[in-house]
Amino acid sequence: MRRTHYAGSLRETHVGEEVVLEGWVNRRRDLGGLIFLDLRDREGLVQLVAHPASPAYATAERVRPEWVVRAKGLVRLRPEPNPRLATGRVEVELSALEVLAEAKTPPFPVDAGWRGEEEKEASEELRLKYRYLDLRRRRMQENLRLRHRVIKAIWDFLDREGFVQVETPFLTKSTPEGARDFLVPYRHEPGLFYALPQSPQLFKQMLMVAGLDRYFQIARCFRDEDLRADRQPDFTQLDLEMSFVEVEDVLELNERLMAHVFREALGVELPLPFPRLSYEEAMERYGSDKPDLRFGLELKEVGPLFRQSGFRVFQEAESVKALALPKALSRKEVAELEEVAKRHKAQGLAWARVEEGGFSGGVAKFLEPVREALLQATEARPGDTLLFVAGPRKVAATALGAVRLRAADLLGLKREGFRFLWVVDFPLLEWDEEEEAWTYMHHPFTSPHPEDLPLLEKDPGRVRALAYDLVLNGVEVGGGSIRIHDPRLQARVFRLLGIGEEEQREKFGFFLEALEYGAPPHGGIAWGLDRLLALMTGSPSIREVIAFPKNKEGKDPLTGAPSPVPEEQLRELGLMVVRP
């Protein structure tokens, strides 16, 4: 007896056929004369019926949920259809039933989603410990199958566009890329280490030097950094690189690719082209370089209105950002939003309610001298609440931008659909206050804007990068740039970052030498596939779209990793554990 059909694939067209099915018992019901079994496989479930006269009846009496069985029977119309199931108009009258494996009772239910009912969530730690059971749930299987469709759509599209898939090494050299490396000791020479790649950045650029022209890879990457909802120590990205291109070429191709992915994987049509904002404009209007465009609530710069106001907090601030909310907020709500602002380095959150003919509450008395101009600038109306953050330009924007997001929750604003945008014209460098040095916004291989090259040493903070981020619903899902292909320019950028010639040779010598053999202009991008899939599925965490993820501490409750290793193995590697 071999399987002839998936249980979830049976329809009215199969009525009258004898079928053999294999899968798990989702639920068992004994009605005193008939026994009903719901048989589940990856395609769904179908109802099986065992009559007392059937040879299958004795086995049906003893099976329990999650047992693995093989069933044989005749497909017939179901007397009472179940509209919640795709197979709800048919059932299988059993002639044979064989137990392939018995099962313990799972520590949490896995059956509800397959019946079209709401799934009850167990604790995440329990789900991760028994991940193989968690993956039996319908939603989790749908997430993994969507992941498959997305990757297949990427492959199909890029293959048609002339891209070549190339695997790059997992064991490579430790180079500074912004996060800590995972190190792998080299057994043959204690004291030497490989590093797991944080990205295939240098290898894909060298593939362009090699003349491959168009490369892509579904790449595994590793970063030893603090974890949060959208981070894992090991993660997956779509990595691609193109030769002889400018910014427009990369953006246009990626828009078409993303539209293809959403069409094939979700049946959703994305409007093209995606809107674009400069980094400066995104920060000014939304207080974020990854703004959520699914709702309005734009920030307004109102500092100039208060230059002669006498309200010193606003008068002396570099920037005063204002946000009009279409609600008269309570003091409790204002206090909650003020805490958000303070967490983002603001000194406080000023506020006032807009009334007919004036303001009330908070800093109302300081606003009266500029009332007309302020209402015009913020487009506030009676019944609204005005919120203000004053301070350094970046702090004011970032803090009120964070308030904007929390306010959208308080107001119950709808955040539906998929709103993409490109953020472009990033600064090449930013000043690190703690280190008192310039550091890169993206990575040190990003090309400066050609128009800004004269400023590189004179005024580095004003140099724009040929860099771009792809943002979806307020989340960065991709980032890339045109790369530096001139070894002399690359050396200049390294020097600006405080990387001297000796350190350049030690850490990047192989790459700088490659550039000296004729590198084409090139650029590319990397998508965070896990983040993208979490957004496509409406999941709260990327752990929901990864088969076997780590928990928030970077540990695996299923396998117990990371775990101690024998002393003998450490000695072989020339290692000794020193506990802090």
From Swiss-Prot:
Cross-referenced Gene3D superfamilies, in alphabetical order?
Answer: Bira Bifunctional Protein, Domain 2, GAD-like domain, Nucleic acid-binding proteins
A GO molecular function annotation here is: nucleic acid binding
One matching Pfam family, short form? tRNA_anti-codon
Annotated positions binding L-aspartate = 177, 223, 442, 483
Cite the binding residues for ATP. Answer: 223-225, 232, 476, 528-531
Indicate where this protein is primarily found.
cytoplasm
Q: Please provide the Gene Ontology terms (biological process) for this protein.
A: aspartyl-tRNA aminoacylation
Q: What GO terms fall under cellular component here?
A: cytoplasm
Tell me its family.
Answer: Belongs to the class-II aminoacyl-tRNA synthetase family. Type 1 subfamily.
Subunit composition and interactions: Homodimer.
Q: What does this protein do?
A: Catalyzes the attachment of L-aspartate to tRNA(Asp) in a two-step reaction: L-aspartate is first activated by ATP to form Asp-AMP and then transferred to the acceptor end of tRNA(Asp). Is specific for tRNA(Asp) since it aspartylates tRNA(Asn) 3 orders of magnitude less efficiently than tRNA(Asp).
The protein in question is named Aspartate--tRNA(Asp) ligase
Provide the species name: Thermus thermophilus (strain ATCC 27634 / DSM 579 / HB8)
The uppermost taxa in this organism's lineage are: Bacteria, Thermotogati, Deinococcota, Deinococci, Thermales
Gene designation per UniProt: aspS1
